[in-house]
């Protein structure tokens, strides 16, 4: 039996319309005053935690009733989350705060399938929600003895600088065809089925300028970073990504690098510091520097492309140019998108009626959606580069808070969790106890069919290539066995290539991916340009210097293709972009000669390469 506790707050019958007010989000020139009413459902006799796992609020927007459903973002912090700041004398102070009972939520609006919400409930409700295809912000008015909140739109916040803002990544494409092709591709339902979530362990660094900007209030800075991470987490789920905050470092006694308006200098400096300092202290996948400095020109963010999991380049820098959390979080998600191999959108790309996250300029309304191009490029990066660091999924045993039956999270001690009895749609699961119903062997999993284990030999994960055999159910478990690849170096595609991390990389496929049909591997003579060591022809980079290929290594540098497509006659076609010099290089593991593969810009014996 569920006992419903109503926490009733006076709800204005006709919301007050305000003309202008100064809030944390800025000077708002048109807003609506609402009085949220909280409705909490707890099992009878249960002790109410400080912040429930699920909450519901009712209020009015434009005179119409709104029901906001919230669920705690339990994956916001990693189990080993840490915070570091520095004493005035420079001493490093690292703590591991208890963050299980936090106050950061994702949610939706009742009866609005297209709605989303990201809310901090620490002191009233602060955040944003999408209602009937429009984004609204909500924030406490901080009046004494009042539960009044302001609801407003982004367009009603006064902007200090109306000039267009943009990402610092510039695209100097030799051809827009790869983007055009990506916009026309469709990821099949079968591919989506076998596309597991990726998990980015995010580390945020805050520079001293941010400390000064916030008058040294470290608690205020921490709260803002939590809110930003919560929004980034919400945005990334559309890419089948989950971002967990593993650490926060505040440069409270001085910057650890020289932070300059020059984004190239600052990004490289931060990347080097991350590699030589931060990574030696804290394991993480991706780091972002938030700074109060005003970058040169209209730039507010900058990142390396296709660098996720790289020990140095898996970083981004973001200017904290707006007091509105959603606006800054969008830039953080945008720059992480670059790290995930995503380029700026073009006219060929779409995300419905909304502005897209990866647009090169910041739109008048904050974006929250990745385009079709972004999804394909991210998928392509993951499949080709196989970044290993984002594959480690947090286990159920990593959830340190007590299990809560009905929250749709499978936790320790539960056999299943399909939500509340009213919402459960799993015929195998008893929603009241989170145990399997009598006669059921399973309630979920790729090897669970009609509450029974799938027959032994049933395919549960398709083969993605000759080097990635399909996995089959064992008949003894509801889970598909772990994804296993053929051994690196095993011949594939009739000896045209060798297996590498589940793929069979050959130059023909790489030419096709860059330029399309009727394009093939070029003659050996074309690859001699890689001996020049110039801006495009080289084998690898060491300390920022481009190293020319040795004669025996020329097929492990820039990729050259022969274009036989209609209207083309280019025997030595190559791809080069200033903003992503790595794109167009021969991929690691590619066959460069009989019995040899590319490894770190060298053509080495396959027997010793792995």
UniProtKB/Swiss-Prot annotation:
Binding site for Zn(2+): 334, 338, 344
Positions of disulphide bridges: 309-389, 349-373, 351-356, 405-424, 405-434, 416-429, 416-434, 418-424, 428-451, 442-448, 447-473, 460-480, 467-492, 467-499, 492-504, 499-504, 511-526, 511-561, 526-572, 539-549, 549-556, 556-598, 561-572, 592-603, 598-603
Catalytic reaction annotation: Cleavage of 5-His-|-Leu-6, 10-His-|-Leu-11, 14-Ala-|-Leu-15, 16-Tyr-|-Leu-17 and 24-Phe-|-Phe-25 in insulin B chain
Signal peptide span: 1-20
Binding annotation for Ca(2+) 2: 404, 407, 409, 411, 414, 417
Pfam families in the cross-refs: ADAM_CR (PF08516), Disintegrin (PF00200), Pep_M12B_propep (PF01562), Reprolysin (PF01421)
CDD domains assigned: ZnMc_adamalysin_II_like
Enzyme class, spelled out: hydrolase
Localization annotation: Secreted
Active site: residue positions: 335
Residues in Peptidase M12B domain copies: 198-394
Tissue: Expressed by the venom gland.
Principal subcellular localisation of the protein: secreted
Positions with a binding annotation for Ca(2+) 3: 468-469, 471, 483-484
Cofactor: how and how many bound: Binds 1 zinc ion per subunit.
Disintegrin domain ranges (all copies): 402-488
InterPro entries noted in UniProt: ADAM_Cys-rich (IPR006586), Disintegrin_CS (IPR018358), Disintegrin_dom (IPR001762), Disintegrin_dom_sf (IPR036436), MetalloPept_cat_dom_sf (IPR024079), Peptidase_M12B (IPR001590), Peptidase_M12B_N (IPR002870), Reprolysin_adamalysin (IPR034027)
This protein's name: Zinc metalloproteinase-disintegrin-like bothropasin
Organism name: Bothrops jararaca
């Amino acid at each position: 039996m569920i006992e419903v506790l109503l926490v009733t707050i006076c709800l204005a019958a006709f919301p007050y319309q305000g003309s202008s007010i100064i809030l944390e989000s800025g000077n708002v020139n048109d807003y609506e005053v609402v009085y949220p009413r909280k409705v909490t459902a707890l099992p009878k006799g249960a002790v109410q935690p400080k912040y429930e796992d699920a909450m519901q609020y009712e209020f009015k927007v434009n005179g119409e009733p709104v029901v906001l459903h919230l669920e705690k973002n339990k994956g916001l912090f990693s189990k080993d989350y840490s915070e570091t700041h520095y004493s005035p004398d420079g001493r490093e102070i690292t703590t591991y705060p208890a963050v299980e009972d936090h106050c950061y939520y994702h949610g939706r609006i009742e009866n609005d399938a297209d709605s989303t919400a990201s809310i901090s409930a620490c002191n009233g409700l602060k955040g944003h929600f999408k209602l009937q295809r429009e984004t609204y912000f909500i924030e406490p008015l901080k009046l004494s003895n009042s539960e009044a909140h302001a609801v407003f739109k982004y367009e009603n916040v006064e902007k200090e600088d109306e000039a267009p803002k943009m990402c610092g990544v510039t695209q100097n494409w030799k051809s827009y065809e790869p983007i055009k092709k990506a916009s026309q591709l469709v990821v099949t339902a079968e591919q989506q089925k076998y596309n597991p979530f990726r998990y980015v362990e995010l580390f945020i660094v805050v520079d001293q300028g941010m400390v000064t900007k916030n008058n040294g209030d470290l608690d205020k800075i921490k709260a803002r970073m939590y809110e930003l991470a919560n929004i980034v987490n919400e945005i990334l789920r559309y890419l089948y990504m989950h971002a967990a905050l593993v650490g926060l470092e505040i440069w409270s006694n001085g910057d650890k690098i020289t932070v300059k308006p020059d984004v190239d200098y600052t990004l490289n400096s931060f990347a080097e510091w991350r590699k030589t300092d931060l990574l030696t202290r804290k394991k993480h996948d991706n780091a972002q520097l938030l700074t109060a400095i005003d970058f040169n020109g209209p730039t507010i963010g900058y990142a390396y492309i296709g660098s996720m999991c790289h020990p140095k380049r898996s970083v981004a820098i973001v200017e904290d140019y707006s007091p509105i959390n959603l606006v800054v979080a969008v830039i953080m998600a945008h720059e992480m998108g670059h790290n995930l191999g995503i380029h700026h959108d073009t006219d060929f790309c779409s995300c419905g009626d909304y502005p897209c996250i990866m647009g090169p300029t910041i739109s008048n309304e904050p974006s929250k959606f990745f385009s079709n191009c972004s999804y394909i490029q991210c998928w392509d990066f993951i499949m080709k580069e196989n970044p290993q660091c984002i594959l480690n999924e947090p286990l159920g045993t990593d959830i340190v808070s007590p299990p809560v039956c009905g929250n749709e999270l499978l936790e320790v001690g539960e056999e299943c969790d399909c939500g509340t009895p009213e919402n459960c749609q799993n015929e195998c699961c008893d929603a009241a106890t989170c145990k399997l119903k009598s006669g059921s062997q399973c309630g979920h999993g790729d090897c669970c069919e009609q509450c029974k284990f799938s027959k032994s030999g049933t395919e549960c994960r398709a083969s993605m290539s000759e080097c990635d055999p399909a996995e089959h159910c064992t008949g003894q478990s509801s889970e598909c066995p772990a994804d296993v690849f053929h051994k690196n170096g095993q011949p594939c595609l009739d000896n045209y290539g060798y297996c590498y991390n589940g793929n069979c990389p050959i130059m023909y496929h790489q030419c096709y991916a860059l330029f399309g049909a009727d394009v093939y591997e070029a003659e050996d003579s074309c690859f001699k340009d890689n001996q020049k060591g110039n801006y495009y022809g080289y084998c690898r980079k060491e300390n920022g210097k481009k190293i020319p290929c040795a004669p025996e290594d020329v097929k492990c540098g820039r990729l050259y293709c022969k274009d036989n497509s209609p209207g083309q006659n280019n025997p030595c076609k190559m791809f080069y972009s200033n903003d992503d010099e790595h794109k167009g290089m021969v991929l690691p593991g590619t066959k460069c000669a009989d019995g040899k593969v590319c490894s770190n810009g060298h053509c080495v014996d396959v027997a010793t390469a792995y």
